[in-house]
């Protein structure tokens, strides 16, 4: 029971064990006792450690939850859980608002003086769109910087400045680990998409482990813990709950896996329970459990163009600027020109003779793989161009991710077979589709994630594509839509699609803006 938002009151038969808490009072009530304890974060943690169940964090009543958005109940519960655990996991599904929960919890600890600086480790693709975006929408009063630069010296300078929140990518930590340790004020490390640290022999794992002290807060977040193999839990547990796993990886492997042949291992019957015990303390919300989430949650992944893409993109943009000088650009001309820019952005462009020119687009494909790793369910990937569909499919096949293609060259009977397998069988896991082939009425509810590997040129088509998964028969209740973008033209088009702006005059206006950027 919470009394006046100041004290916790509960019954006990053994009041003596609470004597270690300075701010407490024991009262005899009948044959038993009631204990009143000051409701502070430290006191709440001690009560939890003493075995008192369901001790609430003071953040639930003593925090103003700053920012544009009112927190949803599952976000409050997640933030409260984080404040009560120095090291913990958040395994909630993608699109449930883990980022905001972690930022609010961090801000609360900073207000209490328990955390001075925060280091956030995440993929490049979500440093700006997810983390910096949510900082601006919530804890805007905190100073923040993205410590990402081609030169290590510049990254080090960013660390040495007094920004309260520093965001960097996994590999970037290796360049600044010494400075982070020397600073001594990074009391909290937040790791997003934590599966990147599943292997404890990698450089990135060792870099992270090197900056942690027994007093460091560490919150690791992923929607799919140990999704590929029970052995994947080892690296994560060694960071958060080292007592929960053996000292050496081979002992963990022998505990959770059976050796079938010289090179083949299979999970033991008890592996799931062992992984669950190792990956604690943890909190998880599925999208279906988050009743206050909208039915469709949209997320953005940003990826830099490769030098090759940037070179040809800028060259083509310059040519367009010359061609447009003094001429009236029609919507048809604008659409054709922007199509070329979109093709380069996605990694495969057509020449005037319909020959395909492939560009280095490895970072974009890696971002797609990140998205797939963050959900355990099936995924639909939409790409405008056949050349890009081929590139995606080839990449997924090399990564041993079962996939099928649907586009204009696939017959109606074969499409029906592919859709039936996608809906009713374990494989394919990914369907790579051309939007034009996504006819009205097609149901693809086996997927709960829709990825746009670049923007479309029509709001109607975009809405139809989202509706393939967001329709009757969807068991997830919530669908996640992911935009992958890199170039200015993509960002402008995705913004127009999100705002449902579908006007031919927009194309000419956007064309003029793009070529003049």
Language model features with spans:
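SF2 helicase motor core recognition
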Residues: 174-179, 228-230, 389-393, 415-419, ...
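Conserved pre-motif I regulatory segment
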Residues: 56-91
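Conserved P-loop NTPase motor "coupling/switch" region that bridges the ATPase
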Residues: 115-117, 132, 161-162, 188, ...
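Conserved helix/coil segment N-terminal to the catalytic DExD/H
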Residues: 152-186
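Conserved Helicase C-terminal RecA-like lobe
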Residues: 93-96, 101-122, 293-317, 321-431, ...
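A conserved SF2-helicase RecA2
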Residues: 457-466, 470-517
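Conserved helicase motor
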Residues: 125, 146-154, 170-175, 196-202, ...
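Conserved helix-turn-beta segment of the N-terminal RecA-like "Helicase ATP-binding" lobe
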Residues: 127-150, 240-243
């Amino acid at each position: 029971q919470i009394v006046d938002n100041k004290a916790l009151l509960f019954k006990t038969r053994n009041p003596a064990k609470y004597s270690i808490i300075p701010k407490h009072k024991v009262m005899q009530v009948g044959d038993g006792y009631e204990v009143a304890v000051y409701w502070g974060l430290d006191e709440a943690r001690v009560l939890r450690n003493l075995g008192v169940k369901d001790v609430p964090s003071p953040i639930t009543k003593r925090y103003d939850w700053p920012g544009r958005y009112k927190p949803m109940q599952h976000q409050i519960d997640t933030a409260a859980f984080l404040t009560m655990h120095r090291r913990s996991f958040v395994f909630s599904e993608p699109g449930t608002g883990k980022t905001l929960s972690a930022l609010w919890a961090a801000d609360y600890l900073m207000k209490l003086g328990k955390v001075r600086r925060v280091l956030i480790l995440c993929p490049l693709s979500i440093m700006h769109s997810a983390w910096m975006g949510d900082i601006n929408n919530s804890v805007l009063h905190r100073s923040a910087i993205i410590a990402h630069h081609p030169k290590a010296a510049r990254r080090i300078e960013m660390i040495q400045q007094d920004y309260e929140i520093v965001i960097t990518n996994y590999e970037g930590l290796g360049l600044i680990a010494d400075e982070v340790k020397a600073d001594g004020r990074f009391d909290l490390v937040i790791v997003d998409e934590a599966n990147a640290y599943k292997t404890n022999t990698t450089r990135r794992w060792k870099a992270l482990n090197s900056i942690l002290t027994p007093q460091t807060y560490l919150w690791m977040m992923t929607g799919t813990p140990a999704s590929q193999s029970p052995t994947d839990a080892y690296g994560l547990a060694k960071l958060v709950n080292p007592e929960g796993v053996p000292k050496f990886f081979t002992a963990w492997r022998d505990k959770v896996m059976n050796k079938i042949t010289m090179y083949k291992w299979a999970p033991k019957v008890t592996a799931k329970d062992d992984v669950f015990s190792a990956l604690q303390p943890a909190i998880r919300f599925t999208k279906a459990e988050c009743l206050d989430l909208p039915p469709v949650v949209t997320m953005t992944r940003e990826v830099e163009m490769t030098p090759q893409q940037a070179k040809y993109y800028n060259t083509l943009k310059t040519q367009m600027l010359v061609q447009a000088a003094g001429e009236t650009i029609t919507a048809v001309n604008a659409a054709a020109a922007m199509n070329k820019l979109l093709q380069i952005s996605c990694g495969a462009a057509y020449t005037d003779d319909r020959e395909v020119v492939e560009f280095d687009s490895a970072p974009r494909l890696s971002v797609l793989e990140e998205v797939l790793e963050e959900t355990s369910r099936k995924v639909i990937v939409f790409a405008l161009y056949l050349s890009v569909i081929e590139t995606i499919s080839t990449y997924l096949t090399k990564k041993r991710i079962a996939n099928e293609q649907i586009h204009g060259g696939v017959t109606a009977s074969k499409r029906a077979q592919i859709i039936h397998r996608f809906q009713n069988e374990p494989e394919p896991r990914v369907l790579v589709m051309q939007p034009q082939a996504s006819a009205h009425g097609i149901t693809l509810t086996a997927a709960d994630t829709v990825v746009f590997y670049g923007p479309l040129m029509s709001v109607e088509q975009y809405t139809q594509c989202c509706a393939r998964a967001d329709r009757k028969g969807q068991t997830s209740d919530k669908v996640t839509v992911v935009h992958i973008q890199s170039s200015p033209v993509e960002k402008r088009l995705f913004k127009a699609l999100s705002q449902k702006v579908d006007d031919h005059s927009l194309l000419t206006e956007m064309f003029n803006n793009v070529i003049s950027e």
